[in-house]
């Protein structure tokens, strides 16, 4: 049985997600101790529970310790089965963090899958759904992943209610040496149950910030009605992204500029990937045939924690050379 220390490095939910995903794909049972030990509320939160439950269903796993607040679980997988699955997080828990747990196993399933997740599409401390769709999945398609993502409804904190459908076909993943891609900036500025000018002002502010620096941006707007109220903006170019969320009392212009500034910082780096993508791609590259290489704009503790889990499962397959990450 693989033993993982959940307090390693940043000690967050990413260790859990990567460990469960790799357990499903490799068929190796795993014990994860000290889950989220470095967080104010240690142990499993509702969101982690839902991700593990989904992985349990698709891999016919036996799981011990699956309850809120649990600081240790044992996950013993069977074989991964494709099919139609639904996950309702029940809160504004992030839909993309569920995908981080189950997308990798579904790429190695016995047949096509459709996964519909209800929860938060645009929430703090998680990749926005448009980033996952336009940056993460783009990088994974280069490896051979075949998946499509549809945003059916948006969900914001605290009510959630967003709905996203991910279609996955089993694929033979191959390593890629990624190069930086320079493209026009694209994006989406959205608001729900708010006046349409909120989305327009976010977009205009982001566009102006970038164009003042010689960067052209095409940003569409979405004005929606739904269960939850909120706004946000996501920008992307090649393998890099930037985003910001609206908050009560925060001017739309500030939201737009925050997103533009975060993308601009990434674009000023010579690296192929932004720091978040460098983290997210790692488990997929580890299970692909052949060698994957990319440079990251910043080496983070999140990446180091992910590498720790991968190397514990598979041997020393992830190496850092300065800001270059090599996976083979």
Swiss-Prot record:
Q: Which residues bind ATP?
A: 100, 276-280
UniProt catalytic activity: a 3'-end 3'-phospho-ribonucleotide-RNA + ATP = a 3'-end 2',3'-cyclophospho-ribonucleotide-RNA + AMP + diphosphate
Query: What molecular function terms (GO) are annotated for this protein?
Result: ATP binding; RNA-3'-phosphate cyclase activity
Its subcellular locations are: Cytoplasm
Entry similarity comment: Belongs to the RNA 3'-terminal cyclase family. Type 1 subfamily.
Q: Which NCBIfam families match?
A: RNA_3prim_cycl (TIGR03399)
Name the record gives this protein: RNA 3'-terminal phosphate cyclase
